[in-house]
């Protein structure tokens, strides 16, 4: 039986790994918040704060 990936799982698999540094680099350029948040979510973190990806809210 073949496993079917959801769109979210597929996107996450594309952005897993070394792309997390790209995500942080994009966030630190202070682009629009929505871009930062989108990149951070694709990197598997919960959001963006002060230009960096947040892996979990404390």
UniProtKB/Swiss-Prot annotation:
Domain of life, source organism: Bacteria
Name of this protein: Uncharacterized protein TP_0645
């Amino acid at each position: 039986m073949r496993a079917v990936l959801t769109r979210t799982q597929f996107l996450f698999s594309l952005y897993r790994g070394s792309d997390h540094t790209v995500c942080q680099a994009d966030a630190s350029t202070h682009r629009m918040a929505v871009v930062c948040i989108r990149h951070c979510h694709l990197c598997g973190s919960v959001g963006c704060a002060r230009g960096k990806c947040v892996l979990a809210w404390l």
